[in-house]
Amino acid sequence: MGPSGSGKTTLLRVLMGLEKAYEGKVSGIPEKRSAVFQEDRLQDFYSALANLRLTLPGIKNETLLHELSLLGLTEADARKPARSLSGGMKRRVALARAMLADGEVLFLDEPFKGLDEKTRTQAIEFVRTHRNGRTLIAVTHDEREAEALGCTILRLEFTDSAALA
């Protein structure tokens, strides 16, 4: 947790191995990782369902449709091209993709951004029920979200060099 500009996303990207730390090194993070980024990273011309199939080929369509329904998405929504989905719908597809993958560590960068209260509650419950004991590292501005996910809360304070408080 921390204010905008405090380095939350940068720290998450360093932990994921997407950026290098200026000092020190990160070790002990398993290779099998799943992530939800602030930008949803869906293939715009594929349907929501096809986006899931790209990274979850071993899961049947019926199962994927059921999982999307737990996030408030209908079968009709799942069959629309990603480019025609709202930002909140894309967010939920990205969340389903990350949670259904077999990553040992789940990295979530503001996973509930842009969701209304009802949908946010559904999404938090989805994460809680699909976590399955995996390590979860989430970035959020909302302390209630962090508490609902059952996370240990670390606060980043912005100084000349961001530090954990």
PLM segments and residue spans:
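Helix-to-loop junction immediately C-terminal to a conserved catalytic motif
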Residues: 16
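Q-loop/switch helix immediately C-terminal to the Walker
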Residues: 45-59, 63
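Conserved ABC ATPase "signature" region
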Residues: 61-77
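Conserved ABC ATPase signature
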Residues: 81-85, 89
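Hydrophobic anchor residue at the start of the ABC signature
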Residues: 95
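ABC-family nucleotide-binding domains
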Residues: 109, 116
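Conserved H-loop
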Residues: 133-140
